[in-house]
């Protein structure tokens, strides 16, 4: 009988394993949605007759103690069966109400009922060692507490699952609601207060460039007119490279403006996030080499730098993939360096930092902190026009940051796009008349004005810069560079230089921001910075070779004229300056080599005083 009792006990633990043959023999009732120990749990509805048959088995297996131990477990089992019989005798309507109205109670009872057969078996095994009934009762109490804890864990898991299944629309609404709440509440900067160290800031004032540091590839905008000195181009026609169309494209990102401003002698700090990969490390190194402060730069080890990869498929087609989300768009609000914003006098940002939802909320938070600290907000629109469908869509997207800006810089094409103006310019003409670059009246720009705006700059490369204030408006004409190389066709080389020149002048004299004379000087300085930027780009990337050099190259050597992988041939600045034009061997504007130059000694022409003293 001992062996029989063992085989009988062996069939009960298999209720946790989903065995279909045992479900019919023991009459299990399955509750949907309940799990225990990673498997589906069952509650057993057995009759008194089957439970009474299991009672003698206990008495035989207890060796003398069966009279005592066999009765008490049978009583407890009878109590459980009485409860189950009552549930079975209830009408169907009451049971349905019980299931609908008391789901939580049913879940707990189902779990407890699934545990009760386990308790009887554990008591049978424990009875072979000791016949103490009180220990069994304490075990029951402890297990009941554990079931309550596990119920709470299940509820927590369900809550986390429900939170994870929130749709994108609800998330966007939540972001908007938090943004509206943050607008109403002022930012508390008391936790960032400390000792006043403003006397250690030095000169010139610090400028914080907020955004991404990356090599931006932007689509071309539209053909653009250029203001040229055609006489100078005719004298130096070897330096003139005339492509079919000149294109105005948006400038670079915040990292490019920071580097351009540092090259002008300004003090600038870059605030953003970089990836922990080779691209991010190279960009961080380049910022440090260019003397840009990187104390507010965060390194993200989980996300990589944004880049696009292209590969050839099996059918010979090109497939491109873009890394998203990237490290540049993952800067959180808690990672904003308030100490840098305290020291800075101007906060610069562009539309690049508004394209991602999380990055947009971080940008708005940084703008509000800067406004609260008294900084000047400089907004560089940098809007790739082919990426936008209408001006209404663009206005609704940039409306919030537009109203927070003190100084805004946009291009002439962006102004016409936002105001819905159709350009009346004549392209590809040699007419340098003032009507070639129209200066729109203040009434046209009035629809873009708001109460916080102090200055609005409208740039057209280095050809012309327009400025608008509440009291004054005007324009300053410039000139495009003479040596246009094959690498400056999009005319965006001077974009960062122009913005850096404007920032440099406005940070030095912020009190003269509404002075018409100072604004004209600022625009002229920005034009010069843009021209120098184009010259430096030409110096770095090379000049187009001359016709005679190409002929000599075909006959003798091909090492003098370098060519890039795209087949564009260029020469260095030294070769361009020292070589003579093929049609003007002794021209007056040719720069001779150093060893052939002649220097004349200057003689004193006259004196300021009669005695001959200077």
From Swiss-Prot:
Q: Which GO terms describe its molecular function?
A: kinase activity
Q: Where is the composition biased (Acidic residues)?
A: 548-563
The protein, known as = Fructokinase-like 2, chloroplastic
Which spans does this entry mark as compositional bias, Basic and acidic residues?
Answer: 571-583
Q: Per the record's keyword annotation, is Protease included, yes or no?
A: no
Other facts: RNAi plants display abnormal plastids lacking internal membrane structures.
Any matching Pfam family: PfkB
Chief place where the protein resides: plastid
How is the quaternary structure described?
Interacts with CITRX/TRXz. Binds to FLN1 and PTAC5. Associates with the plastid-encoded RNA polymerase (PEP) complex.
PANTHER family on file: FRUCTOKINASE-LIKE 2, CHLOROPLASTIC, HEXOKINASE FAMILY MEMBER
| Stretch list, region Disordered | 47-75, 542-592
Q: Which UniProt keywords apply?
A: Chloroplast, Kinase, Plastid, Transcription, Transcription regulation, Transferase, Transit peptide
Q: Subcellular location, in the record's words?
A: Plastid, Chloroplast
Domain of life assignment: Eukaryota
Recorded family membership? Belongs to the carbohydrate kinase PfkB family.
Taken from the UniProt entry, a GO cellular component term is: plastid-encoded plastid RNA polymerase complex
Task: State the protein's purpose.
Answer: Required for proper chloroplast development, most likely through regulating plastid-encoded polymerase (PEP) dependent chloroplast transcription. Acts as a component of the transcriptionally active plastid chromosome that is required for plastid gene expression.
The family database entries (Gene3D superfamilies) matched by this protein are listed as: 3.40.1190.20
């Amino acid at each position: 009988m001992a062996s029989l009792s063992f085989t009988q006990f062996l069939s009960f633990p298999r209720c946790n394993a989903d065995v279909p043959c045992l479900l019919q023999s023991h009459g299990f009732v399955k509750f949907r949605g309940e799990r225990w120990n990673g498997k589906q749990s069952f509650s057993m509805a057995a009759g008194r007759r089957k439970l009474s048959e299991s009672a003698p088995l206990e008495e035989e297996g207890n060796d003398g103690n069966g009279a005592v131990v066999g009765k008490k477990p049978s009583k407890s089992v009878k109590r459980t069966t009485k409860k189950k019989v009552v549930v079975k005798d209830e009408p169907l309507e009451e049971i349905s109400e019980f299931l609908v109205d008391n789901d939580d109670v049913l879940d707990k009872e189902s779990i407890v009922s699934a545990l009760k057969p386990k308790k009887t078996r554990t008591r049978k095994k424990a009875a072979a060692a000791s016949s103490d009934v009180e220990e069994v009762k304490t075990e029951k109490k402890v297990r009941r507490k554990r079931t309550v804890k596990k119920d709470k864990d299940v509820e927590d898991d369900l809550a986390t699952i429900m939170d994870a299944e929130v749709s994108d629309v609800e998330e966007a609404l939540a972001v908007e609601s938090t943004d509206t709440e943050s607008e109403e509440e002022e930012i508390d900067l008391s936790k960032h207060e400390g000792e006043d160290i403003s006397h250690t800031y030095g000169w010139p004032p610090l400028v914080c460039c907020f955004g991404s540091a990356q090599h931006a590839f932007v689509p071309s905008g539209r053909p653009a007119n250029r203001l040229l000195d055609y006489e100078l181009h005719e004298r130096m026609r070897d330096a003139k490279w005339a492509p079919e169309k000149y294109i105005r494209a948006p400038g670079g990102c915040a990292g490019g403006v920071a580097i351009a401003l540092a090259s002008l002698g300004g003090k600038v700090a870059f605030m953003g996030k970089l990836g922990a990969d080779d691209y991010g490390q190279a960009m961080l190194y380049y910022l440090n080499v260019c003397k840009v402060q990187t104390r507010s730069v965060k390194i993200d080890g989980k996300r990589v730098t944004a880049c696009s990869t292209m590969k050839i498929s099996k059918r010979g087609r090109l497939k491109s993939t873009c890394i998203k989300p990237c490290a540049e768009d993952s800067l959180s609000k808690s990672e904003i360096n308030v100490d840098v914003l305290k020291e800075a006098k101007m906060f610069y940002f562009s539309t690049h930092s508004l394209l991602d939802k999380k990055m947009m909320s971080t940008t708005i938070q940084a703008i509000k902190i800067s406004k609260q600290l008294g900084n000047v907000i400089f907004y560089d629109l940098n809007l790739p026009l082919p990426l936008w469908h209408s001006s209404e869509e663009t206005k609704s997207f940039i409306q919030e940051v537009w109203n927070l800006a003190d100084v805004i810089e946009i291009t002439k094409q962006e102004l016409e796009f936002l105001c819905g103006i159709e350009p009346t310019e004549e392209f590809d003409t040699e007419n340098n008349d003032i009507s070639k670059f129209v200066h729109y009246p203040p009434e046209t720009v009035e629809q873009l004005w708001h109460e916080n705006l102090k200055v609005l700059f409208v740039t057209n490369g280095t050809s012309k810069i327009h400025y608008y204030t509440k009291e004054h408006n005007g324009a300053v004409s410039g000139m495009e560079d003479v040596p246009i190389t094959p690498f400056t066709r999009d005319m965006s080389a001077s974009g960062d230089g122009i913005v850096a020149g404007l920032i440099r002048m406005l940070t030095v004299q912020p009190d003269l921001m509404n002075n018409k004379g100072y604004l004209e000087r600022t625009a002229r300085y920005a034009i010069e910075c843009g021209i120098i930027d184009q010259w430096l780009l030409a110096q770095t990337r090379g000049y187009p070779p001359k016709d005679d050099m190409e002929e000599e190259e075909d006959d003798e050597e091909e090492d003098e004229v370098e060519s890039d992988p795209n087949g564009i041939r260029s020469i260095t600045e030294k070769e361009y300056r020292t070589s003579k034009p093929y049609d003007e061997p002794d021209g007056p504007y040719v720069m001779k080599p150093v060893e052939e130059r002649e220097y004349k000694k200057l003689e004193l022409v006259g004196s300021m005083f009669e005695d001959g003293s200077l």
